[in-house]
């Protein structure tokens, strides 16, 4: 069993499709993911299901280090947007290459691209990078101030955060997950695993990332 506080991938894909249509009037999309990666391919499938225009898809082998062919294909196909829900390592390479190429096609990414390392790769360039996120800095000023103070006092934490004190969404989610677990422990009145599992479905919590509850499968019910 599991209990997770994040938005589901199908919801992320739907939001990104809606964004592509509303902001760019997108009718043609290029989707790129790692071959055999369930996360990448699942999000691409959800994106395609919700996108009512033309979708061109490619998959790259694991350990690919040159994405020139793929980005050149997107340009040649004259697509309106590129959707690449890939890992941080691949995303950093793709964004860096897009910057060096002067690519003017908007890049859309899932929550994995909401990383300071990836965002830094786009700094100083004209790359249009848009990502789905669980938390935007400014959502909870008190939380932001506390995390920034900690980052600036701990050089290792700062390095792990991408070398700056921008609040990463995963930080907010980890913070909320901790307190959701704490609420379950309080409700159970015990640290017994079975008791905590039984208490979790009824936990509701308002965290820095919004209101959190669970459905019968352990997936998050979010109103934000």
Give, region by region, the residue ranges found by the protein language model.
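Second-shell loop/turn segments in exported
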Residues: 1-7, 33-36, 130-137, 163-169, ...
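Segments of small-molecule ligand-sensing domains
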Residues: 155-172, 182-224
């Amino acid at each position: 069993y599991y209990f997770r506080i994040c938005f589901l991938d199908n919801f992320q894909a739907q939001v990104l499709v809606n964004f592509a249509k509303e902001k760019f009037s997108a009718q043609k999309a290029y989707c790129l993911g790692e071959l055999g990666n369930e996360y990448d391919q699942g999000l691409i499938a959800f994106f395609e299901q919700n996108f009512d225009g033309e979708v061109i898809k490619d998959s790259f082998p694991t350990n690919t280090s040159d994405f020139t062919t793929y980005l050149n294909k997107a340009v040649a196909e004259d697509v309106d947007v590129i959707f690449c829900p890939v890992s941080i390592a691949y995303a950093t390479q793709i964004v860096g290459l897009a910057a060096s190429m002067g690519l003017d096609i908007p890049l859309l990414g899932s929550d994995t691209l909401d990383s300071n390392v990836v965002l830094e790769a786009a700094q100083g360039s004209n790359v249009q990078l848009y990502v789905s996120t669980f938390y935007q800095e400014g959502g909870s000023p008190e939380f932001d101030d506390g995390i920034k103070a900690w980052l600036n006092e701990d050089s290792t934490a700062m390095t792990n955060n991408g070398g700056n004190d921008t609040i990463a969404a995963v930080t907010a989610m980890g913070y909320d997950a901790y307190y959701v677990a704490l609420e379950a422990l309080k409700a159970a009145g015990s640290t017994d695993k079975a008791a905590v599992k039984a208490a979790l479905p009824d936990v509701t919590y308002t965290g820095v990332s919004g209101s959190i509850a669970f459905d019968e499968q352990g997936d998050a019910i979010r109103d934000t």
